[in-house]
Amino acid sequence: VRTRLYLRGRVTSQDFAYEDLAAGLREHPDAVAWLDLLEPSAADLATVAADYGLHPLAIEDALAEHERPKLDRYPDHLFVNVYAVSVPSAEEKPRKVEISAFVTKRVLITVHKDKGDVDLLTERWDRETDAALATSGGIDFLLYGLFDVVVDSQYAAARTIDESMDSIEDAMLGEGGAPRSVRLRGFAVRRTLAQLRRAVAPMEDVVAQMLRPDGDLVDDSLRPYYRDVEDHAERALESIEHSLTRVNELLDADLAEQSNVLNDVTRKLAAWAAIIAVPTALTGYFGQNLPYPGYQQRWGFVESTVLIVVAGGALYFYLKKRGWL
């Protein structure tokens, strides 16, 4: 459990016991609080739910795994589910940290099953230098910091993949089609993008719901900041979709190149088969089984057998080298 008490955007106390949270809010009527729970049990969340009036369906979503990113409205609070992500490389599976948040009037309660890097969130709140943003100091200020950290991680992951696309393109557009290892690399990138898209795609709508004209969830002074996060979420999704379209086009181009190579090989083999078929047909039709050196001799049989094996082996290695086998 991690706790913080904020007054006008500044920390007044932190890392105090959960039992002292309510007292701190009573002592400072204008303060808001952050409560962070790592891998809480159902009993832990039931206690928090009873203290802060959290809806049972929201508690159920917080305990479940792999919930889609969303923002749900309940009579006394909001429930938000988002994913902070990181991508070590374009071919590796993205690392996703699922974060659930209960947003009450004076307390932001975050729940996550993976330790992740919560320090990024606290650092984001602590380094805020904009006076208008910091002095607003409400729950919308804390939620803005959470959204900003999450969307920044998603945009950074999208940029990592986008920057690696040139090398993937160069590797896949070789003459004759990409080698199997490069093709598998392309499939790995597509899988990474698909997984990343599931985490990023709903974020623009999640942030936009906070800015609905019919709601008073965000202070007017904070609306430009939320719109900035919304814009970053849109750009992250556009980057992912652009990379996904690009890698799909590369895989399609590679498949077309392989088809062209196969057609060329088939044409050459058909041409050689036609050339060989003419003398074979004529000699077969006229029954021209002529004596050859060593005919009816033991050494002649050995010689012809060796010739067949050598010629067949040479043809096999030639075709193997050309990539036809």
Regions found by a protein language model. Name each.
Residues 1-219, 225-228, 232-242, 324-325:
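Peripheral, non-transmembrane regulatory/ligand-interaction domains of membrane transport proteins
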